[in-house]
């Protein structure tokens, strides 16, 4: 709701510029993590004896990646918008969050130990505190740039508190060590995921950047209003999957049948949870936009009705991404994501000039569907996953599996 209030306060054009700056920064965010998150969690679960070396080396890599990413962000924004001083300032401030990525080793540790509650506490706590601060900024009539500073401060506070929680509930920082050899091993496994993560961010955020460059900041503001409602649900699959991933990995080591049963249950849950969200939002989109954002954002209604269905593919995609990690098929994940990103960019070039924001939303749906489901059919290694996802659409079979699961408990 704070994001909605900020949008109403700033208006479509200024909110569009802020959204453009955030999307631009996120476009480079994947570079700063170097594709390490899933690899590190996997190694912490499978190789607990090397945890000190894994965590210490990861922290060093994230620090280096953050610095290099920030430099890349600055160079690119000066090239893309050479005459837009405010955009350059906003991106410079928001991009500074990349410098605090090393604290994310705490997130990886908590996830590997199935105690992600600490991460949730910190993230929710910092969000609530800075939500209050942003309310004060609105009430005091502060300019656009103040919200960028607040976002940076929120990232810094979250990083500091996460580090403290890690010190209290994880290995002692003094025990961590950095190894060049271990860094090479991590990067060897993570580079496909790095490229895949970059491609993911491209096909998730490039629409806002292309709208800003091809149509204008006001169009980005209208589009971002719809996307904000559509994407507000994306924390759900991430939280659920992060909690069950270690259990799925353990099932893989003991029984392949149980492993795929757990995976099927996860697909079922992700699909119908997303449909349960998308259906009411589709029919209530105009009322939702009018109530939340006001009349000035009413053009976002048809965009929301389309874009909300991306959640179906996002929910399934988050679940299946863990399967690629467990099966060490990062290359396949990378290949399909690259294809999705290219399709998204190409379709945006075709659709945005004619259909503007509605075209961008439609392009998002098409590219997500190709990456998450359709591409599974065309590769032998992933065909089983394709049929598992398709089977999740059969509500009768889902209900039957739920009954069997309930009776076994």
Could you tell me what each predicted segment is?
Residues 91-95, 121-168, 339-343, 357-380:
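Hydrophobic alpha-helical transmembrane segments
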Residues 1, 21, 26-77, 89-90, ...:
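Membrane-water interface segments that mark the loop-to-transmembrane alpha-helix transition
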Residues 43-46, 99-123, 145, 308-336:
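Membrane-interface junctions at transmembrane-helix termini in multi-pass inner-membrane proteins
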Residues 117, 144-148, 162-204, 247-261, ...:
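Interhelical loop/hinge segments that connect adjacent transmembrane helices in multipass membrane
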Residues 12, 77-94, 217, 257, ...:
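Interfacial segments at transmembrane-helix termini and the short loops linking adjacent helices
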């Amino acid at each position: 709701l704070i994001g909605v209030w900020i949008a109403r306060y700033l208006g479509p054009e200024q909110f569009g510029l802020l959204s453009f700056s955030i999307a631009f920064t996120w476009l480079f965010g994947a570079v700063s993590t170097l594709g390490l998150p899933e690899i590190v969690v996997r190694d912490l679960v499978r190789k607990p004896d090397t945890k000190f070396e894994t965590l210490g080396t990861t922290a060093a890599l994230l620090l280096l990646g953050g610095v290099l990413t920030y430099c890349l962000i600055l160079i690119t924004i000066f090239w893309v918008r050479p005459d837009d001083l405010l955009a350059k300032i906003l991106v410079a401030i928001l991009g500074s969050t990349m410098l605090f990525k090393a604290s994310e080793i705490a997130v990886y540790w908590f996830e590997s130990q199935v105690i992600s509650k600490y991460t949730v506490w910190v993230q929710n706590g910092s969000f609530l505190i800075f939500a209050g601060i942003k309310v004060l900024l609105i009430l005091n009539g502060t300019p656009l740039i103040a919200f960028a500073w607040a976002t940076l401060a929120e990232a810094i506070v979250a990083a500091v508190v996460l580090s403290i929680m890690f010190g209290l509930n994880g290995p002692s920082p003094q025990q961590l060590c950095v190894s060049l050899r271990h860094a090479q091993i991590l990067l060897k496994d993570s580079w496909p995921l790095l490229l895949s993560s970059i491609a993911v961010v491209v096909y998730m955020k490039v629409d806002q950047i292309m709208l800003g460059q091809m149509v204008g900041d006001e169009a980005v503001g209208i589009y971002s209003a719809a996307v904000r409602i559509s994407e507000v649900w994306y924390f759900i699959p991430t939280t659920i999957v992060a909690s069950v991933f270690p259990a799925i990995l353990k099932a893989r080591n003991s029984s392949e049948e149980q492993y795929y049963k757990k995976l099927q249950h996860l697909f079922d849950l992700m699909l119908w949870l997303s449909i349960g969200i998308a259906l009411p939002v589709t029919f209530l989109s105009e009322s939702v936009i009018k109530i939340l954002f006001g009349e000035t954002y009413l053009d976002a209604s048809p965009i929301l009705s389309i874009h909300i269905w991306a959640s179906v593919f996002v929910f399934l995609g988050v679940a299946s991404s863990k399967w690629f990690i467990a099966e060490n098929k990062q290359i396949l994940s990378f290949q399909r994501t690259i294809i999705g990103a290219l399709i998204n960019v190409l379709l945006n070039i075709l659709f945005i000039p004619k259909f503007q924001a509605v075209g961008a939303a439609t392009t998002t749906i098409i590219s997500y569907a190709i990456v998450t489901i359709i591409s599974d059919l065309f590769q032998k290694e992933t065909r089983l996953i394709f049929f598992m996802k398709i089977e999740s659409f059969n509500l009768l079979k889902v209900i039957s599996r739920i009954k069997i699961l309930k009776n076994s408990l």
